[in-house]
Amino acid sequence: LISEPMARLGAKVTGIDASEKNINIAKMHSMESGLKINYVNTSPEKLEDFETYDVILNLEIVEHVDNVDLYIKSCQKLLKKNGLMFTATLNRSLTSYIKAIIGAEYILRWLPIGTHDWNKFLKPEELESYLTKEKLITQDISGLKFNPFNKRWKKSSDLSVNYIICSLKN
């Protein structure tokens, strides 16, 4: 979802996804849009012999990963020295359960029921612990709030539902 906007802004983009179906749809859409994006059907764990990157965007992925420790370790290996990794996910809180699962999946039907497993959500300090273990230094933690009326996201100090951590590889 983020690859095309980043390419439109002039970034050299490699987009990866473990789902072949998602990659094929993304390739077709980027060709129709005239965007040059390198899409790869894989996961970070399998990309270790690949090139390294200045920036890695892990947006709304970590809460779907079975082995967060291995995932973060693999992403860290793909990051250049002094590179930045942005990791956005859902906090494991009562508020996130109500808004992200009951609200978004069951009431509003924005997502298929069962998309999220609340037990896989990470509290900010848990995610920070995984990042620190891999020598990634937290630069910023911000909440993200969605306004359903204007369909826009904005930065917030509220970490109770969605949040993003920017970390630096030193």
Give the location of each predicted region.
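Conserved class I S-adenosyl-L-methionine
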Residues: 84-109
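A conserved beta-strand element that flanks and buttresses the S-adenosyl-L-methionine
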Residues: 57
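Core SAM-dependent methyltransferase catalytic element
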Residues: 151-170
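A short glycine-rich, Lys/Arg-flanked "PGG" loop and its adjoining helix->strand segment in the class I
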Residues: 69-84
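Short alpha-helix
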Residues: 118-141
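Acceptor-substrate binding/catalytic loop of class I
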Residues: 89, 108-126
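Hydrophobic adenine-recognition pocket in adenosine-nucleotide-binding enzymes
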Residues: 61
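Class I SAM-dependent methyltransferase SAM/SAH-binding core
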Residues: 1-46, 70
